[in-house]
């Protein structure tokens, strides 16, 4: 039980850190879009 709770807390902290780094969920989406565009241009 304690390991599961600790795992959920760590996942929540990781997710919050990731979203904070991109400022918002919208910013995260834009970052993924730019990454996709970069990959497309590199493949061309």
From Swiss-Prot:
GO terms for biological process: response to toxic substance. InterPro entries: Entericidin. Keywords: Cell membrane, Lipoprotein, Membrane, Palmitate, Signal. The keyword Transmembrane helix does not apply. A lipid is attached at residue 22 (N-palmitoyl cysteine). It comes from the Bacteria. Residues 1-21 form the signal peptide. GO terms for cellular component: plasma membrane. This is Entericidin A. It comes from Citrobacter freundii. The lineage of its organism: Bacteria, Pseudomonadati, Pseudomonadota, Gammaproteobacteria, Enterobacterales.
């Amino acid at each position: 039980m304690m390991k599961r709770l600790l795992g959920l807390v760590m996942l929540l902290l990781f997710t919050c850190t990731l979203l904070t780094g991109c400022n918002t969920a919208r910013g995260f989406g834009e970052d993924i879009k730019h990454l996709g565009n970069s990959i497309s241009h590199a493949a061309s």
